[in-house]
Structure formats: structure tokens, C-alpha cells
Amino acid sequence: MSGPLEPPRRSALEFFDRQFERQVEARDYGLNPFERAVLPHLSGDVLDLGCGLGNLALEAAGRGCRVTALDSSSTAIADLARRAGARGIALEAHSADLRHYVPARDYDCVVSIGLLMFFACGDARRLLARMREAVRPGGLTAVNVLIEGTTYLDMFDPEACCLFGHDELSEAFSGWEVALSRHEDFPAPSGTLKRFHTLLARNPARP
């Protein structure tokens, strides 16, 4: 971590804290479709940025990955640490504001599912670039974002959100080996729409 981190934006954090509290109460710990797509590709040292309740982090660590899981929600991180301890699974889980986060080292896999769209576009794109830099030669990045065409915006802080361009992730990892590139639409409340792009790309440089 690069140093003292600024307080996170409140509205998105409060939105997800409430959601996480409901999920914990309901014991709703299933992997979402994006996490299920990513999990088989993870190995070695894994950095999970915006891990939420840590369902992916916990499953990856249970399969032998060495996982560092970070999220802005102390509610989510506390529950992840509790569940990992109960299952005897070793992982690192920390609460942090990720807008200006700089990875302290490199990793075999760097994951960000459903995080970057909650930052102003400048912050989101800079973090995406730092994620790319943190992937070891031959390593993998797995990124999932909302893209243009999304009409469900209730969870966003209006001053800090970013809908990525349709192919912006692909362009950001131009020259990398694409393991998966998937555009998907999901219905949302009141007839709105969530439009996602999920990209798994491997650093072509070899160790």
C-alpha cells in the first residue's frame, strides 16, 4: 500500500454495507456468475481488489492460492476473516480505500470484479493501469466492469462513477493473450439494465 489512504466515498460504500449485512444475515455466500467464470483460472499469488464478502477469495484460497483480499467495507472484511478462520483457510483480508491503491509487489493473478465503475473515470483508469503493471510475466488479470448502456445507477455516487466503453478493457490489455472476453446484459429494478464486460487476459511475457 502506498501510504495513508483517503476516506472512501460514502454513498456507494453505504449501499454495499447494507447489501453485505443482508447477505450475511441470509448466509448468501454463493459465487456470482463472474466469480464462477474467473475461479478456474486462478493460481499462485492472487490479489483480489474489491473482494466484497470474499466468496471468490475464500474459494481460491481453499484451492491452494495465496490470496490477498481487499475491500472498502469493514463489514465484508470482518465476515470474510471470520469465515476463513472457521474453515481453517489462510488468507490476508484487509479493509482499504482502493481508489489510489498501489500494489506493493507483483502477483500471478490480479482480480477486480465489480469495483472500477465506482470510482471517477480518471481514478478507475489509473488503478486499471496499476493492476496491469502488477501482473507477473505469464500471469493473469481478471476484470469485470459495467459499461456504457447500463441504465441502473442507484448504487452510484453521482460524483464518482465510470461506465467503461464497450471495448475499453480489451483496448487497455491490447497485446495480452485473451482467455475470456464476455459482454452480458442483466435486468435490474424498474426496467433498467446492467451491462457488463468481463475480461481475462494473460501477460504474454514469459518468466
Feature locations, PLM:
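A short SAM/SAH-binding and catalytic strip from SAM-dependent methyltransferases
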Residues: 109-123
